[in-house]
């Protein structure tokens, strides 16, 4: 499994990139609005930080021609931009056109397997099932990841699965076991994934033993 960082915060992106643990970035209008910055300017900043790693940038238009126009503008910012498109009929029409133009797409707001299958057949590079939001309404988001992975494997579908709306490290571990290709996670989840009390205790013990040896 690969990891994308789900944020528009450049400091978090820098930290994750410097550790060498991410293979891309996902953003959405809410994340960019939270930063209070110009969308295109921030995308350029992100692309400068991560080089040729995938950067998903979402369109705002709701009609296919508008999505395609916006997507072309986004893709012109850098060759590694992946255009993020909502799972709607207009979105599928746009995905088909982006495929013909050679522009990668990430179909977002996937909440059932049929949506993922349709997006893949339209030509999506990635589909993003939302784990946490399904959990919020009493459904098992991880079951959806497994179902999509099984369907794609049975039919030889190459569209990659991005586990999205990841709330905690357990989501990551289980998504990896269930067949997700990628998990896109906030920086706080990356931090949580690295932590374990026995790791901290072990470091403290090593340092204590070293200092004791040096004082003799």
UniProtKB/Swiss-Prot annotation:
Coiled coil: none annotated. It catalyses: D-sedoheptulose 7-phosphate + D-glyceraldehyde 3-phosphate = D-erythrose 4-phosphate + beta-D-fructose 6-phosphate. The active site is at 84 (schiff-base intermediate with substrate). It is an enzyme of class 2 (transferase). It comes from the Bacteria. It is found in: Cytoplasm. PROSITE patterns: TRANSALDOLASE_1, TRANSALDOLASE_2. Pathway: Carbohydrate degradation; pentose phosphate pathway; D-glyceraldehyde 3-phosphate and beta-D-fructose 6-phosphate from D-ribose 5-phosphate and D-xylulose 5-phosphate (non-oxidative stage): step 2/3. One of its GO terms (biological process) is pentose-phosphate shunt. Its main location: cytoplasm. Its EC number is 2.2.1.2. One of its GO terms (cellular component) is cytoplasm. Belongs to the transaldolase family. Type 3B subfamily. NCBIfam families: fsa_talC_mipB. This is Probable transaldolase. It comes from Exiguobacterium sp. (strain ATCC BAA-1283 / AT1b).
């Amino acid at each position: 499994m690969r990891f994308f960082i789900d944020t528009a915060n450049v400091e978090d992106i820098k930290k994750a990139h410097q550790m060498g643990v991410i293979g891309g970035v996902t953003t959405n209008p809410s994340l960019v609005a939270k930063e209070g910055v110009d969308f295109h300017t921030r995308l350029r900043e992100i692309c400068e930080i991560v080089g040729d790693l995938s950067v998903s940038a979402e369109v705002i238009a709701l009609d296919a021609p508008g999505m395609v126009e916006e997507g072309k503008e986004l893709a012109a910012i850098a060759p590694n931009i992946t255009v993020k498109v909502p799972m709607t009929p207009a979105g599928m029409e746009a995905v088909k056109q982006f495929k013909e133009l050679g522009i990668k797409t990430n179909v977002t707001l996937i909440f059932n397997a049929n949506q993922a299958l349709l997006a893949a057949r339209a030509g999506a590079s990635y589909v993003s099932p939302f784990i946490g939001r399904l959990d919020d309404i009493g459904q098992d988001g991880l079951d959806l990841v497994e179902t999509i992975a099984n369907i794609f494997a049975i039919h030889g579908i190459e569209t990659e699965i991005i586990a999205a709306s990841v709330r905690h490290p357990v989501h990551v571990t289980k998504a990896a076991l269930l067949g997700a290709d990628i998990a896109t996670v906030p920086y706080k989840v990356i931090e949580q994934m690295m932590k374990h009390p026995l790791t901290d205790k072990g470091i403290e013990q090593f340092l204590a033993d070293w200092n004791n040896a040096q004082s003799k």
